[in-house]
From Swiss-Prot:
Zn(2+) binds at residues 79, 156, 399. The keyword Hydrolase applies. Its EC number is 3.4.11.-. Its cofactor is Zn(2+). HAMAP family: Aminopeptidase_M18_2 (MF_00467). SUPFAM superfamilies: Aminopeptidase/glucanase lid domain (SSF101821), Zn-dependent exopeptidases (SSF53187). The lineage of its organism: Bacteria, Bacillati, Actinomycetota, Actinomycetes, Mycobacteriales. PANTHER family: ASPARTYL AMINOPEPTIDASE. This is Probable M18 family aminopeptidase 2. One of its GO terms (molecular function) is zinc ion binding. Belongs to the peptidase M18 family.
């Protein structure tokens, strides 16, 4: 098994929610000597390696000695969230003797893939701190026991056996027991998390697949896991930042929540998160707003998100002249109507980075007769004015509860992003 693929499996297994992704990345950054800063406090005026966390988003950077106040940024951006089934605020139901938890889809979840799976619960609780008046703290939740399951209708009862139509309001609720009254999921979660249910003020809870991530295939060259979209890019960007070496440019890792639902939030790619952090980096180094503004057009951002490999059962769904393979290198994504932010200049820059890393680069275009998804790329580029290129690793079954990629792509994806941080591009 490739070492990087095994490490990615551990990363994904430890990160069932966006909050856990940030906690996992933060832990590895701290182990590497990074220091966490607060957005509401003054930042150090000396070089160093730092990061901030805003709920389910994280930004990290490495400012070495001698980096000029107007030196450009090299940014790898990715997203921490994945499509899933999320717990409603009043989830407890009793239906025909079944204790039911009401769920609803988050993002473009491929609903059929969540049926008949053993599911855990993860996320966070906002709780009243003991002995601290009205202060609120967050507690991460991770229950890996198989407490929930969304059962499929038996084929004998289906009106149409040739197709499957799921109503997101009625057909994706989970059973978790039987009885003569509804259970209390909140009481269960609070007890498992070690807090008093009376101290729980609010919840952000979601479900996750319990089958561990694993390398599969006769030649052990495929990786099966939940949340490949987009924890693979979070992992690869983190590894690239940790391996980055001092350079004239300042490397930044930006991991955003809420990409799967449009990025319009206090911590999404449409927010002020990245632009505020970048400007504060300049100000803390003794520069001014003019120095910050001078940096932006000379900077470069990689929007790192997963890409569609050509599906062997549905090759007709892909652009015939742009067939994408797994274990064949990262994927450059281009769209003439700017569903991706790539242009000729940014594509050339990433090509140079891949050449310096000795990594093959594939090129993807979407079929013109099918709607195309998007990424944080166009949003972050418009918000900051930084030239942007959209890239990713190839995978199958995007937005399913469980996805598939090439095990050898993990290392080359990280290597390409590491080269991007240090290559002379502009």
């Amino acid at each position: 098994m490739p070492a990087s693929a095994a490490d990615l499996c551990e990363f994904i297994n430890a990160s069932p929610s966006p909050f856990h992704v940030c906690a996992t990345v933060a832990g590895r950054l701290l182990d590497a000597g990074y220091a966490e800063l607060s957005e509401v406090e003054r930042w150090p005026d000396h070089p160093g390696r730092y990061f901030i966390v805003r709920a389910g988003s994280l930004v990290a950077w490495s400012a070495g000695q001698g980096v000029k106040a107007h030196a450009p940024f090299r940014i790898v951006g990715a997203h921490t969230d994945s499509p899933n089934l999320r717990v409603k605020q009043h989830p407890d139901l009793l239906v025909a003797g079944w204790r039911v938890v009401a769920l609803q889809p988050y993002g473009g979840a491929w609903l059929n893939s969540w049926l008949d799976r053993d599911l855990g619960v993860s996320g966070r609780l906002s709780v009243r701190s003991a002995g601290k008046g009205s202060e609120i703290t967050d507690r991460l939740v991770r229950i890996d026991d198989p407490i929930l399951r969304v059962p499929q209708l038996a084929i004998h009862l289906a009106e149409d056996r040739k197709s499957l139509t799921l109503d997101p309001q009625r057909h994706v609720n989970a059973v978790w027991g039987v009885g003569d009254k509804a259970g209390s999921l909140l009481e269960y979660v609070a007890e498992r998390t070690g807090v008093a249910v009376a101290d729980v003020l609010a919840v952000d809870l979601m479900t996750h697949d319990l089958v561990p991530s694993m390398v599969i295939g006769a030649d052990a060259n495929l990786l099966s896991a939940p949340r490949l979209d987009n924890q693979v890019s979070c992992y690869a960007g983190m590894e690239a930042l940790l391996a980055s070496v001092p350079h004239d440019c300042l490397p930044v890792l930006a991991l955003f929540d809420h990409e799967e639902v449009g990025s319009t939030s206090d911590r999404g790619a449409r927010s002020n998160l990245l632009s505020t952090v970048l400007e504060r980096i300049v100000l803390a180094a003794g520069g001014g707003r003019d120095d910050y503004l001078r940096r932006l057009p000379a900077s470069l951002l990689v929007s790192a998100d997963m890409a569609h490999a050509t599906h062997p059962n549905y090759p007709e769904c892909h652009e015939p002249s742009h067939l994408i393979e797994v274990n064949a290198g990262p994927v450059l994504k281009v769209h003439p109507n700017l569903r991706y932010a790539t242009d000729g200049r940014t594509a050339a820059a990433f090509e140079v980075a891949c050449q310096q890393a000795g990594v093959r680069l594939q090129r993807y275009e979407h079929r013109a007769d099918r709607p195309c998804g998007s990424t944080i790329g166009p949003l972050a580029s418009a918000r900051t004015g930084i030239p942007t290129v959209d890239v990713g690793a190839a995978q199958l079954a995007m937005h399913s509860a469980r996805e598939l990629m090439g095990a050898h792509d993990v290392a080359v994806y990280s290597a390409a992003l590491q080269a991007f941080f240090s290559a002379d591009l502009f």
